[in-house]
Every structure is written in structure tokens, then in C-alpha cells.
């Protein structure tokens, strides 16, 4: 068995970060298309698919417990097995209309995925030397992004292809069973090839052996929270993290329902397979935008880059106004519009990440960055909860005009932040 300290990172890093991405995108993206196709109204769909992302908001609360209870490797394998079982049950329950039970298992998948994130990132730092960590940072990022393409494009294309030969419910059952089987194979693979790190006890707790573990954990959590909320400019930073992605938070919940809705209902009347193809193009351009945005920000500096990148994130949302008003039939016109929007999203999201890295600088950089991402998730979750209820009385065209109006606070808070940098 290759389960030892000297296993090459190539044997487990690609699959580890692919496994980190798949359940995340299943919960945050694929669930929207699933419930839309199964007939859930937009208001309920947006509300419930937002609520099931709550584990990523509160993830920092239990992160210290993962550091001290058992090992990171144990947590990784346990969470992968739990996600495998949860998705397996989803495959049978959701397509049959057991929505409440399905939402419970989506929430379990989300909790397991959030915990897996903590354990995987911690294991990465324990199992690799500093030199190896630097060498593989691009690899882990690449395979996480491949998981994005897999879920938002390839899975939807598979669902659409299956729907040509079977029912909507059966197509989702077969697809989710395939995802469960893939997660099972990855879990087995990691049980064989993930190395056993020599020491996985939290350094903080090693230095204080006289203090009970539980007391040490809560002291560490409390100190981290207090110092975070005492940071200079915390009020402005929180406003930025909550408002910067406001237009995107609304769009995320209604994009796919808009694509799938019939034209007489204000949508584009696309098949699931076509939506997957369009997002295949869009996600690639989003990744390109992220690369270009990072390079440009490093060249001109965050202060000069932030406002233009915020405009790149928000203003391309206008393509949805155009699509809802014109309702074009051309695959290439629709793909070009989504490609522009996704390219802008990639550029704009980079600015958000760079600002959070900048704000988190200090004694507890990693923990404070985790809190920043939690606040950012809250900024996505809360608007997403009401997105469907905004769309239902207004229709898609009216809803997209509301999204454009929401660009104003996003750009305004970015302007204020830029002046303070």
C-alpha cells in the first residue's frame, strides 16, 4: 500500500481538490437546475438553495475542532464517504419529489463539504514541505476549477443527453448516482494513496498541554473573532464583503431558470444540454478573466485595479437585460453574451479575493481570511434567498433591471474602499 509519508503528491492532490470542488458546485449550482426542472417555483427554489449554503457561512466556528479531533486524513476520508452516501440518497429522493428530505441531504452534503475544505487545506500544509506547497498551489487550483467545469457544464450536458432517452426524473437519478460512484472511487483511492502525516496535532494546542482541549479551542476561536472585529476599518470592510457581489448573488439563483423557462414565460426556452454547452464556454472565459485580473492587479496595484474590476463584475449583467428583452434563438449570440458576463465575473471576483487577502493581513491571517470568506458567503446567501420572490411578480426582464440597479451600491462601496486603501 502506498499510504506513507513519501507518496508522491501527484497521486492525491489532483483528486483531493477535484473532490473538494464537486460537492460544492453540486450544492451551490447543480441544485438550482435540479429543482427548477422538477417544478419547484422560483421563489421557493432560490430561498431553499440559498439556505443550504449556510454551512460555508459558519464554517469558521468548527474549523478549530477539525484541527484537534483525530487527524486531517481521517476527516478527509470520513467527509468524502459521507458526501458519497448523501449524494447517493439524493439520487433516489430528489427526482421523486421528496423535496424536504432532499434539501436535508443537500444540507448534509454542504456541511460535509465545508468540513472537507478545512481538513483538505490543513492536510495539504501538513503533508507537504514549503517548497512542495508552492509547487502544487497551481495544481490544486486547476483541479478545483476542473470540478467547476465538470459540474456546471459536463453534468448538465449528461442530464440533457439522458433526457432525450428517458424521463427528467430518471436522468437526474442516473446522473447523481454517477456522482456518488465517482466520490466513492475517490474515497477508496485516497484511503490507499493519501500519505499519513507524521504530526497532525494543532501547533497552538501542543504548546499548552496543561489547558483542556475544549477550553483551548474556545479560547482560540474567541480570540480570533475579537481581534477580527477590532481590526481597523472593519465596518467598511464588512459592507464591502456584503455588497460587492450583490448583483451576482441575485443572478446566480435565476440564470439557469431563465435559460430553461419557455419563451412565453419570459425565458429563452433552452434545453439542459444546451445550457451545459453554454456554461462550458462561459466557465473557461471566467477562468481566463481570473488569470488576467490577477496579473493586472499585481502590475498596477490593488487600489488602481479595484474600481475597474468592480465595473467588470457588475456592468456585464446588462447582457441578461438584452437576452430577456430580445430572446434570441442563436446559440452563438447567447454564448457570446454569457461569455462576456463570465469574463467580467472572473476579473471582478479576483478583486474581491485580493481585497480580503489584504484586509486579513496580521497575526491571524489564515483565520481572518476564513472569516472574510464567511462574510462574503453571507453576502451571497441573503440576497439569493429573496431573488426568486423578486422575480415572480416582475418577470425575468423586470428582475434583471433590478439586478442592474443593485450594481450601484456595489460600485459605490468599491469607490469608498479604494479611497481608503
Feature-to-residue mapping (PLM):
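Juxtamembrane intracellular "pre-TM" segments in multi-pass secondary transporters
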Residues: 2-7, 197-237
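Helix-loop boundary and gating motifs at the non-cytosolic
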Residues: 3-56, 235-240, 244-264
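Loop-to-transmembrane helix entry
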Residues: 40-54, 264-285, 333, 367, ...
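Glycine-rich segments within core transmembrane alpha-helices of 12-TM secondary carriers
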Residues: 56, 135-159, 373-384
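Helix-to-loop junctions at the C-terminal end of transmembrane segments
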Residues: 57-71, 289-304, 391-392
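C-terminal ends and interior cores of transmembrane alpha-helices
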Residues: 77, 81-97, 311-329
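C-terminal membrane-cytosol helix-exit motif in multi-pass small-molecule transporters
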Residues: 180-202, 413-418
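C-terminal transmembrane helical hairpin of 12-TM major facilitator-type secondary transporters
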Residues: 303-352
Amino acid at each position: 500500500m502506498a499510504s506513507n509519508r513519501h507518496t508522491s503528491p501527484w497521486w492525491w492532490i489532483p483528486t483531493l481538490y477535484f473532490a473538494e470542488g464537486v460537492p460544492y458546485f453540486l450544492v451551490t449550482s447543480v441544485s438550482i437546475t435540479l429543482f427548477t426542472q422538477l417544478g419547484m417555483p422560483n421563489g421557493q427554489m432560490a430561498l431553499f438553495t440559498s439556505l443550504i449554503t449556510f454551512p460555508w457561512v459558519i464554517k469558521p466556528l468548527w474549523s478549530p475542532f477539525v484541527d484537534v479531533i483525530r487527524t486531517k486524513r481521517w476527516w478527509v476520508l470520513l467527509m468524502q464517504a459521507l458526501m458519497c452516501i448523501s449524494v447517493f440518497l439524493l439520487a433516489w429522493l430528489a427526482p421523486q419529489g421528496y423535496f424536504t428530505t432532499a434539501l436535508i441531504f443537500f444540507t448534509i452534503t454542504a456541511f460535509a463539504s465545508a468540513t472537507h475544505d478545512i481538513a483538505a487545506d490543513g492536510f495539504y500544509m501538513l503533508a507537504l514541505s514549503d517548497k512542495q506547497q508552492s509547487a502544487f498551489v497551481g495544481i490544486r487550483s486547476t483541479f478545483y476549477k476542473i470540478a467547476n467545469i465538470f459540474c456546471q457544464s459536463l453534468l448538465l450536458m449528461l442530464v440533457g443527453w439522458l433526457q432525450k432517452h428517458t424521463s427528467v426524473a430518471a436522468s437526474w437519478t442516473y446522473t447523481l448516482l454517477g456522482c456518488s460512484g465517482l466520490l466513492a472511487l475517490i474515497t477508496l483511492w485516497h484511503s490507499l494513496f493519501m500519505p499519513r502525516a507524521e504530526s497532525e496535532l494543532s501547533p497552538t494546542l501542543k504548546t499548552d498541554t496543561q489547558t483542556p482541549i475544549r477550553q483551548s479551542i474556545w479560547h482560540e476561536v474567541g480570540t480570533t473573532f475579537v481581534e477580527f472585529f477590532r481590526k481597523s476599518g472593519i465596518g467598511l470592510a464588512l459592507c464591502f464583503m456584503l455588497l460587492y457581489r450583490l448583483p451576482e448573488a441575485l443572478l446566480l439563483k435565476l440564470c439557469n431558470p431563465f435559460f430553461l423557462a419557455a419563451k412565453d414565460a419570459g425565458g429563452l426556452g433552452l434545453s439542459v444540454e444546451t445550457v451545459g454547452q453554454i456554461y462550458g464556454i462561459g466557465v473557461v472565459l471566467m477562468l481566463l478573466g481570473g488569470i488576467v485580473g490577477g496579473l493586472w492587479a499585481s502590475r498596477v496595484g490593488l487600489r488602481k485595479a479595484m474600481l475597474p474590476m468592480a465595473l467588470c463584475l457588475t456592468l456585464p449583467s446588462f447582457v441578461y437585460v438584452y437576452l430577456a428583452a430580445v430572446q434570441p434563438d442563436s446559440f452563438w449570440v447567447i454564448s457570446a453574451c454569457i461569455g462576456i458576463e463570465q469574463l467580467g465575473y472572473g476579473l471582478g471576483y479576483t478583486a474581491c479575493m485580493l481585497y480580503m487577502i489584504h484586509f486579513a493581513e496580521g497575526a491571524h491571517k489564515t483565520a481572518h481570511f476564513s472569516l472574510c470568506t464567511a462574510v462574503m458567503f453571507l453576502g451571497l446567501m441573503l440576497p439569493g434567498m429573496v431573488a426568486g420572490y423578486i422575480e415572480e411578480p416582475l418577470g425575468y426582464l423586470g428582475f434583471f433591471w433590478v439586478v442592474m440597479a443593485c450594481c450601484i451600491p456595489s460600485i459605490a462601496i468599491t469607490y469608498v474602499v479604494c479611497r481608503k486603501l
